[in-house]
Curated annotation (Swiss-Prot):
GO terms for biological process: mRNA processing; RNA splicing; tRNA processing. GO terms for molecular function: RNA binding. One of its GO terms (cellular component) is chloroplast. It comes from Quercus robur (English oak). The lineage of its organism: Eukaryota, Viridiplantae, Streptophyta, Embryophyta, Tracheophyta. It is found in: Plastid, Chloroplast. InterPro entries: Domain_X, Maturase_MatK, Maturase_MatK_N. Belongs to the intron maturase 2 family. MatK subfamily. This is Maturase K. HAMAP family: MatK. Keywords: Chloroplast, mRNA processing, Plastid, RNA-binding, tRNA processing.
Length: 504
């Protein structure tokens, strides 16, 4: 990123143009409005390095521009082999280069906003598991939570309009519309889930940039409203990127809310409001009454409808009591449970017992959705009975065991924070027996006969419990150390959810 910093001659907090128009400005307007170009496509499949430089992208755009290969037309969009499903090499280079370039100013703004802050040094905060210690500390003292599913925009043009509040660059918006036009039917009023899935899989970096911009716009307004409703200011809100006309839009929303809620036009003060989000799912928790949660529910619905033109029904936000309902978040079922404890107290000659029942966050492995994921991956049937998995005939026994072992360790690693290990033991049993049946099928035998024939040390590593490694490494490990390992452990090196765990 340092090599591109020289292109940004203006103050990065006052710059309205992205980096790429300095390189591609003369071609972006023609790409978006070139309806009269000849209908020819460049279909040569030329190999290239995945780490394509900006020079390759610039040369590609120059060549396509000079040879009239850039064309956008609503009539022949379905027959256009250049973009289509994004299998064409030049489309991939062009869109990836575009995504890389537009990320640079945001990256530099983030680094500048965090300059000198201690949070930069804590790289472990990137871990998904770093959220759960926060939940363990805050949620036992809260009463209600709102399970929020952030809706997708109804049309890709909304994403372009969202970026207009941050960027004053017409050529940037032209080229952005060019890409979005080829990935979807612009004449359609809505985006189907299928088109979103194709778009996200064909160019994940480009899709994540647009989606993160949409989420950043939504959270910048939401956190502003949250700050108005709290006596305490958020320290993390300073990381948000600069927005154009932010406060003018907030004043407009204040008028909208005042008109929609004439009886209570002001915000209710709540110093115990907490917000957590991962991808498109978020949780809003509070210690106050359900009245405040329902008011926030109305705020969010009006925010999506008035600002993003996204229809969201109030039923999409579920308000539950933490002590009676579980939260399905980050592939865990989390709930607040009372942890009864008896404390013996003695004063002089008198002794008495105190019954204490503090709240505790309970995290459980979602066994039914996880078995459904294993059944979909052909490790078991719908009721959880292990079955043999089809494998290539050229795989050795060691490679098959190693693959099953890798899956088992990943799941055990991710669900190490579960407060009850019984469900995880069942998942391990399914994977282990599926491995045995797979090997028995390969050797044209039964599972029982195969286990009798092989050496006892053949599955030693696979059947060794993770807790046994403590005894192997530290033979004289104390009881407290082993008890600590058998409890909940949150790892700070997990940056994504396992595919089998991601049942959302």
């Amino acid at each position: 990123m340092e090599e591109f910093q020289g292109y940004l001659e203006l103050d990065i907090f006052r710059q309205h143009d992205f980096l790429y128009p300095l390189i591609f400005r003369e071609y972006s307007x023609x790409x978006a409005h070139g309806h009269g170009l000849n209908r020819y496509m460049l279909l040569e499949n030329i190999g290239y390095d995945n780490k394509s430089s900006l020079l390759i992208v610039k040369r590609l755009i120059t060549t396509m521009y000079q040879q009239n290969y850039l064309i956008i037309s609503a009539n022949d969009s379905k027959q256009n082999p250049f973009f289509g499903y994004n299998k064409n090499l030049h489309s991939k280079i062009l869109s990836e280069g575009f995504a890389i370039i537009v990320e640079i100013p945001f990256y530099l703004r983030l680094i500048s906003s965090l300059e000198g802050a201690e949070i930069v040094r804590f790289y472990n905060l990137r871990s998904i598991h770093s959220i759960f210690p926060f939940l363990e500390e805050k949620f036992p003292h809260l009463n209600y939570s709102a399970d929020i599913l952030i809706p997708y925009p109804a049309h890709l043009e909304i994403l372009v309009q969202t970026l207009r509040y941050r960027v004053k660059d017409a050529s940037y918006l032209h080229l952005l519309r060019f890409f979005l036009h080829e990935y979807s039917n612009c004449n359609s009023l809505i985006i189907t889930n299928k088109s979103i899935s194709i778009f996200s899989k064909s160019n994940p970096r480009f899709f994540l940039f647009l989606y993160n911009s949409y989420i950043c716009e939504y959270e910048s307004i939401f956190l502003f409203l949250r700050n108005q409703s709290s006596h305490l200011r958020l320290t993390s809100s300073g990381v948000l990127f600069e927005r154009l006309c932010l406060y003018r839009k907030i004043e407009h929303f204040a008028e909208v809310f005042a008109n929609d809620f004439p009886v209570i036009p002001c915000f209710l003060k709540d110093p115990f409001m907490h917000y957590v989000r991962y991808q498109g799912k978020s949780i809003l928790a509070s210690k106050d009454t359900p009245l405040l949660m329902n008011k926030w529910k109305s705020y969010l619905v009006n925010l999506w409808q008035c600002h993003f033109d996204v229809w969201s029904h109030a039923a999409s936000i579920r308000i539950n009591q933490l002590s009676k309902h579980s939260l399905d978040f980050l592939s865990y079922f989390s709930s607040v449970r009372r942890n009864p404890a008896v404390v013996r107290n003695q004063m002089l000659e008198n002794s008495f017992l105190l019954n204490n029942a503090p709240n505790k966050l309970d995290t459980i492995v979602p066994i039914i959705p996880l078995i459904g994921s294993l059944a979909k991956a052909k490790f078991c049937n719908a009721v959880g009975h292990p079955i043999s998995k089809l494998t290539r005939a050229d795989l050795s026994d060691f490679e098959i065991i190693n693959r099953f072992l890798h899956i088992c360790r990943n799941l055990s690693h991710y669900y190490s924070g579960s407060s009850k290990k019984k469900n995880m033991y069942r998942i391990k049993y399914i994977l282990r027996l599926s491995c045995v049946k797979t090997l028995a099928r390969k050797h044209k035998s039964t599972a029982r006969a195969f286990l009798k024939r092989v050496d006892s040390e053949f599955f030693q590593e696979f059947f060794t419990e993770e807790g046994g490694f403590i005894s192997l490494i530290f033979p004289r490990a104390s009881f407290a150390l082993r008890r600590l390992y058998s409890g909940r452990v949150w790892y700070l090196d997990i940056i994504f959810i396992n595919g089998l765990s991601n049942h959302e």
